[in-house]
Swiss-Prot record:
Signal sequence, renumbered to the chain: 1-19
Function: Involved in cell envelope biogenesis. May act as a membrane fusion protein, connecting MmpL transporters with periplasmic proteins, and play a role in cell envelope lipid changes during biofilm maturation.
Name by which UniProt lists this protein: Lipoprotein LpqN
Region (Disordered): 26-53
Record's subcellular location: Cell membrane; Secreted
Length: 228
């Protein structure tokens, strides 16, 4: 088992099925067809910060940040003053470097059914300063997924933890480019040094690879450590 260690800031997410790991909803057990081809990563578009989330009818963390004049700073690996987060990299997955699609890096499955559309779990990390209520951050965490086109999920999700810190998780399905996809998000709040760091873990895969995503999410839930 490989690991990547990082100085963390704002958003964390996670997946779960029937109370375990990232809240992933499944209607039937999928059948996967692994290949040995190295995938060309095609992640769901992810905002570099929570305040850049797409608008929609459901109130989001981005709306809370805007309406309360909170300052948000993107956090990258090695930034001074940020917590240390150790996220596991499950077998048959590999690291994703930081990029516009993976602002704080992430992981990608190396044996996908479609090499051009592999399952991914992408991280975003932010530092919030100002008049912040961590409970409000978690309260509005479900809004981003619920604003996805055709999203169907398990209500508003459920309270959780990651590495000993409070979190909120939600999962379900939505449609993109005519294909049904599984999506899940875990948002973690990490109070540290007069600020609140938010870690978002965004998981996304074609519906047929839901179980692959869930297995990776279970590893993340069980083995992640966070040191403020």
């Amino acid at each position: 088992m490989k690991h990547f260690t990082a100085a963390v800031a704002t958003v964390a997410l996670s997946l779960a099925l029937a109370g375990c790991s990232f809240n992933i909803k499944t209607d039937s057990a999928p059948t996967t067809s692994p290949t040995t081809t190295s995938p060309t990563t095609s992640t769901t578009t992810t905002s570099a910060t929570t305040s850049a989330q797409a608008a929609g009818p459901n109130y989001t963390i981005a709306d809370y940040i805007r309406d309360n004049h909170i300052q948000e700073t993107p956090v990258h690996h090695g930034d001074p003053g940020s917590p240390t987060i150790d996220l596991p990299v499950p077998d048959d997955w590999r690291l994703l470097p930081e990029s516009s699609r993976a602002p704080y890096g992430g992981i990608v499955y190396t044996q996908p059914a479609d090499p051009n559309d592999p399952p991914t779990i992408v991280a975003i990390l932010s530092k919030l300063t100002g008049d912040i209520d961590p409970a409000k951050v978690l309260q509005f965490a479900p809004g981003e997924l619920k604003n996805l086109p055709g999203f169907q999920g398990s209500g508003d999700g459920s309270a959780a933890t990651l590495g000993g810190f409070s979190a909120w998780q939600l999962g379900g399905s939505y449609s993109k480019n005519g294909k049904l996809r599984t999506v899940a998000q875990k948002t973690v709040v990490i109070p540290s040094q007069g600020a609140v760091f938010v870690l978002q873990l965004n998981a996304d895969a074609l519906d047929d690879e839901t179980m692959t995503l869930m297995d990776a999410a279970n590893v993340i839930d069980e083995q992640t450590t966070i040191t403020p």
